[in-house]
Amino acid sequence: MFEATTILGYKGEYNGKKCAIIGGDGQVTFGNCVLKNNATKIRTLYNGEILSGFAGSTADAFSLFDMFERILEGRKGDLVRSVLEFSKEWRKDKYLRKLEAMMIVLNTEHIYILSGTGDVVEPEDGTIAAIGSGGNYALSAARALHNYASLPPREIVEHSLAIAGELCIYTNTNIKILEL
């Protein structure tokens, strides 16, 4: 189920201004068949202050989005507290523990991966996170471009997802991007 997409999140600073960017490809795969090539797997939450994206089962991901959005509203947009509460709820609920989806959530201050087991992972570098079947390709490309090229963050995300789309059969180059 996790072989259906690539999502890449980037949090950083450019020209003295903090930024957060998330991008994803548009491919939806069922077995060895591409069902759709222009799906949207990223969205804004909490009045456009939080970016999010998912990989995995679409129905499961929407359940997680709804739950996370409710918690985020209750915590008045506090991403750190919302992520921790979300993880606690996820682990307590037997139904949620069986969901086959992962999420990236970020703003200009924080970036997290929410795993299918309810784990919360903050990326080692605190800047770049990737999930999905092409996630490792996108992550590698993004780290290289971040460290060795002088590109704007949006271009880093675009180029990294394009590279993943060239290498991963479950990822395409129909890229959508959101930014704060």
Swiss-Prot record:
Keywords: Allosteric enzyme, Cytoplasm, Hydrolase, Metal-binding, Protease, Sodium, Threonine protease
Gene3D superfamilies on file: Glutamine Phosphoribosylpyrophosphate, subunit 1, domain 1
Catalytic activity as recorded in UniProt: ATP-dependent cleavage of peptide bonds with broad specificity
GO MF term set: metal ion binding; threonine-type endopeptidase activity
EC annotation from Swiss-Prot or TrEMBL: 3.4.25.2
Name of the top EC class for this enzyme: hydrolase
Cellular component, GO, one term: HslUV protease complex
GO BP terms: proteolysis involved in protein catabolic process
Active-site residues (renumbered): 5
Keyword presence, Secreted: no
InterPro entries the record matches: ATP-dep_Prtase_HsIV_su, Ntn_hydrolases_N, Proteasome_sua/b, Proteasome_suB-type
Main location: cytoplasm
Pfam family for this entry, one: Proteasome
Compartments where located: Cytoplasm
Role, per record: Protease subunit of a proteasome-like degradation complex believed to be a general protein degrading machinery.
Name of this protein: ATP-dependent protease subunit HslV
Biological classification of the source: Bacteria, Pseudomonadati, Campylobacterota, Epsilonproteobacteria, Campylobacterales
